Amino acid sequence: MPINAITSDHVIINGANKPATIVYSTESGTILDVLEGSVVMEKTEITKYEIHTLENVSPCTILPGLVDSHVHLNEPGRTSWEGFETGTQAAISGGVTTVVDMPLNAIPPTTNVENFRIKLEAAEGQMWCDVGFWGGLVPHNLPDLIPLVKAGVRGFKGFLLDSGVEEFPPIGKEYIEEALKVLAEEDTMMMFHAELPKAHEDQQQPEQSHREYSSFLSSRPDSFEIDAINLILECLRARNGPVPPVHIVHLASMKAIPLIRKARASGLPVTTETCFHYLCIAAEQIPDGATYFKCCPPIRSESNRQGLWDALREGVIGSVVSDHSPCTPELKNLQKGDFFDSWGGIASVGLGLPLMFTQGCSLVDIVTWCCKNTSHQVGLSHQKGTIAPGYDADLVVFDTASKHKISNSSVYFKNKLTAYNGMTVKGTVLKTILRGQVVYTNANGVSKTPLGQTLLDSRR
């Protein structure tokens, strides 16, 4: 069995940054041993292995491959927006070794087993990282939920308002209550895009203000998120019996934090995530007409951004994800700069590690938020997100001393457009290892052969 080892004075293990050597099999793709302390080849612990190669990457840091649990790959059906090939290549270029694909924006959406089969066929031979899948909560598919669990989806996502694509309509309170019953005994999760406009509320603004970011922001106020989360919590509290865990995706409003905090304190199984763009960008920075910053919920104020950081450090927000939601430049309506008539989504898979490090986060915290907690959310905490024996040998070599500039031309996305264009960030991914195989180096780019696998085993 071919065995390699990689060592550094800086390895993120057991919630600390310390010297260690990782011994892994390139055949099984798993970690065999983690030897703490500076490596000495004469040590008994390492001489028991027939090491083929030992690589010392000091002073760079080794951390587990990131798990991005919120990615739209859009295949099949909207491959002009993204696809498995380009989306997963972008992931590994930034140290993301696992992504979980959202059920919408592909055609057909992942709302029944047949649609899921079509998606799995489309993914075959095109995955540069490992890929899991979410199923969809849409009207009339309650009978499809348990079959989808058995087919391998890791949970379900639904919208409480228009999703932006007609094939993925929103659900209401009655559906949520029924789905909680249907999935109560299943090993799964229910997730929600938590925005809920009031029935009489007009989201549109006068035509002349459509270029103004402030107009778009005011059209989707904090109350949308607060009202949606209140509805979801009301359904949970009304359920007289077991419920599956519930997750609020891409939380943008700090004003909703007290609701989550109180629900968790009362014992409700509720978690939430936020996104890199909500932590790294504030509304005050967004120029009028700059529709590449549009996302839903919207990026809010600087004080709101700071409030999200506080909630993340407190643990009320548990994880940070990309919500990679790309589209063609035409759908961003760049020439007109109309925020109301452009696609809402920010392309950013693979950019999160240096973005978070630039914000002053320790790598230990980044691993907690972007590896450990996301792997737990998707039911992969036994396999992904941790450097320990028995786990997949998904590893990232990160140069903390370097800086680089993010540019539209350098990203691997199909459409070279990101809100971070021109931003200088700290830290560079030098190498990404997926299950013991090098799949990316900063010097040579992505591997020629896709080595990613689908993750269809039951949650654990």
Curated annotation (Swiss-Prot):
Designated gene of the protein: DAL1
What does the record give as the function of this protein? Answer: Catalyzes the conversion of allantoin (5-ureidohydantoin) to allantoic acid by hydrolytic cleavage of the five-member hydantoin ring. Involved in the utilization of purines as secondary nitrogen sources, when primary sources are limiting.
InterPro entries associated with the record: Allantoinase, Amidohydro-rel, DHOase/Allantoinase_Hydrolase, Dihydroorotase_CS, DNase_TatD-rel_CS, Metal-dep_hydrolase_composite, Metal_Hydrolase
Protein name (Swiss-Prot/TrEMBL) = Allantoinase
Q: Name one GO cellular component term.
A: cytoplasm
UniProt entry tagged with the keyword Manganese: no
Q: Name one GO molecular function term.
A: allantoinase activity
Identify the Pfam families for this entry. Amidohydro_1 (PF01979)
The record's annotation in CDD domains points to: L-HYD_ALN
Q: Which GO terms describe its biological process?
A: allantoin assimilation pathway; purine nucleobase catabolic process
As stated in the Swiss-Prot or TrEMBL entry, residues carrying the post-translational modification N6-carboxylysine are K157
Cofactor detail note: Binds 2 Zn(2+) ions per subunit.
Q: In which pathway does it act?
A: Nitrogen metabolism; (S)-allantoin degradation; allantoate from (S)-allantoin: step 1/1
Q: Which UniProt keywords apply?
A: Hydrolase, Metal-binding, Purine metabolism, Zinc
PTM description: Carboxylation allows a single lysine to coordinate two zinc ions.
Q: Which family does it belong to?
A: Belongs to the metallo-dependent hydrolases superfamily. Allantoinase family.
Root EC class: hydrolase
Which reaction(s) are listed as its catalytic activity?
(S)-allantoin + H2O = allantoate + H(+)
Assembly, per entry: Homotetramer.
> Does Ribosomal protein show up as a keyword for this record?
no
Task: Cite the binding residues for Zn(2+) 1.
Answer: H70, H72, K157, D323
- Supply the SUPFAM superfamilies for this chain: Composite domain of metallo-dependent hydrolases, Metallo-dependent hydrolases
